[in-house]
Amino acid sequence: EFMNLPGFFGTRAPLFMDIVSLIVAALPFLMLGIIFLARQKKYKLHALLQGILYIVSLIVLSFFEVGVRFVGGFKSFMQGSGVGHDYAFIVLIVHISIAVVTIIIWTTTLLMAKKQLENGKHKRAGWITFTGVTLIMLTGAWVYMLLFVY
């Protein structure tokens, strides 16, 4: 029942999708703040919050996946859209591809942080992860617009 409640953005999206979209929209800003903690040499706090953000993101992703499956997936979302199926599907595949690569890089960055710090690669890996999270937010908004606005 909860998964089918109407969202709060005033679109065709269900409530769970609006909740997830709001959280994903905040992710790059939260991550940027955590990155700046490292620049201020607050490394322990940086590591703690980065780990928490990662775990919360995985929980949100799981909530999203359950919700999508519960309401019928991409096909059910496409029923209300005025956008062509193939176009929306390609955008969705791009979004999913970016998300998968970003999660792999983020996981590796967290697990290999000490080693990356020693060889000077952690900072670069962090910025790549930040870029990926930002692209997830942007492509996710694109998918949301195609499925629930147009």
Model regions and ranges:
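Alpha-helical membrane insertion/targeting regions
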Residues: 1-150
